[in-house]
Amino acid sequence: MRTGLTRLAPALAAILLPVLTACVSVGIGTDVPLQAHYLLHDAAVPAPRRAAPVVAALSIQALPADATADTAAIAYSQRANEFAYYQFASWTERPVRRVPRLLQQRLEARGVAGAVGMVGEPVRADWLLTLAIDTLHHDAAALPGQGRVALTAELFDRRNRTRIARRQFVATAATASADAPAAAAALSQALTQVFDRLVPWLETELQQAVVAPK
């Protein structure tokens, strides 16, 4: 009996080793044994502040997000319309909450409005910007892949309940490797690119709306 177990040991080890290795994987073909948390951030160099705000106040409302953004898990996709999540890597905060706050900080730093608040905060604003995250994931169809972010922004005039403008912003940033740390870094870069396009668009739309005939 002992001889049989001795013979089985190498075979069992050969079977179990790949399984145990897969259990600690947080990358596509990469092994990192510890749980890691990543901060989604705006990597832009602060832009010069406007001499004067375009409007007195602006409110931001986060709309329901795509499933890839309504979870703390970091999503990746190797095939179209099919997603998975890194097992031992996550965001410090769900993107559906984090992204609007980051945009608020960018708009405040730029001085687009005298006050920028989230819906529900004590800020009275005639202008409302809604923000929907259409996707936020590591596109790994061709390794090492790229971070892909898509946001849809809509600007409303609350005084007459009309939509002023609507636009989707999409950006990608190459990942340095096919793993969670590189995916998190690339997604922050892609989000920064989206903000770089969204903020000038918003300024222009607000400027035109302010001077438009009532």
What is the predicted function of each stretch?
Residues 54-56, 70-72, 79, 87, ...:
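Envelope-exposed proteins and targeting segments
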Residues 60, 103, 131, 151-153, ...:
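Buried hydrophobic packing residues in well-ordered domains
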Residues 81-90, 159-200:
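Short secondary-structure boundary motifs at beta->alpha junctions and helix caps
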